[in-house]
Amino acid sequence: MDSYRPAPHGVEAPRRHSIGWLIPSLILVIIAAGWCAFWFYAAERSKEMMAGWIEREQRSGRIYTCVDQSLGGFPFRIEYRCATAGAELPNAKPPVTLAATSILAAVQIYQPTLLLAEIEGPLTVADPGQPPKMTADWSLAQISLRGTPRAPQRISFVTDEMTLDRNDEDKPQRIFNASRAELHGRLSKGTVRENPVIDIATSLVAASAPELHPLAKQPFDFATDARLVGLKNFEPKAWPERFREIQQANGRIKVRNLRLRQGDLLAVAKGSLKLTPSGYLEGELQVTATGVEKILPALGVEALARSGGSRSERLGAALNFLDKMAPGAIAGAVSLLGEQTELEGRRATKMPLRFKDGVATLGPVKLGQTPPLF
């Protein structure tokens, strides 16, 4: 049987513990210190990039202010928070001032060219030096920017449960709301410095604009996919200047898809538009729509005969008579608008939506004057 034998006098017994555990600890400390140094370096780079975006916006005529700002997000994000954020748009027509509760912008350490931001409402719109005339609010508003200030690639803006009120003296008046609104833009061809081609997509879900037009009182879904061709570059500048460039270069706005749904009404359109030297739209979209007979009365019978021409006069007289004597028979006049066809299995009408010096006409029906883009 083995027995314990004490070590001889003057000889130290071997220790069962060692300093081996210190090595991984030191490695962890070095990694943590390196990560901290890297985070602060990345934070400085991110601050420079955010400053670059702000400078680009300033050169585009949009000036931003921030009452209180802070930096955080360690260890995996760089977060920039701005409390009581503001913006001045002196080049807008008319000039306006915006103010929001706060903005939180963030950049991931591993994805420094993607900037994400959330805007906390409400956001007020005012004439310079005047009380707010409109107030916008939402449950969520997000912006994403991909690329760098010198070479932007993509921008997106998304809101949920958005509302826009006009601040009347008595009480706010709702002028727009949407369950969801989206705006996306991206560089499709060319470069930022030479002949860029820009794709723009928008969408509205369950939107309404009671004061815009009687037809816009009821909720509708709307989506567009368009392409801008004719820009010289995408250097910082106001959008009216960009549209002027497109006109001078004989460029165009290619509407690749437009879709509108409201109740039984479904309309799709595509075509190409140009700009006149005065900034008005010029061109034609081919529209195919179902349920047209239900919206004709809302367009205003008095406007139907203003287009001139025998066909327009016949349509105006027919609708005027049918509207008074037999409202249910107004659908028979729809054939005067254009070619009868089908859309998604339903009976539809194909008709041109024309723009001439900004005046929009749907078939022979005059819709109204659109504003100039510059």
Where in this protein do the model-derived segments appear?
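Alpha-helical transmembrane signal-anchor/signal-peptide segments
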Residues: 41-58
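Extended terminal
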Residues: 2-25, 67-68, 243-248, 258-260, ...
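Extended lipid/amphipathic-ligand handling interfaces
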Residues: 69-71, 100-110, 136-150, 173-193, ...
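N-terminal beta-strand/beta-hairpin edge segment
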Residues: 59-191, 258, 269
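Hydrophobic membrane-insertion alpha-helices, especially the h-region
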Residues: 21-39
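Beta-strand-enriched cores of mature, soluble protein domains
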Residues: 182, 200-204
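Flexible, membrane-facing loop/turn or short amphipathic-helix motifs
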Residues: 86-96, 123-134, 161-176, 206-217, ...
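Short, hydrophobic/aromatic-rich segments at coil-to-beta transitions
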Residues: 79, 153-156, 196-201, 250-257
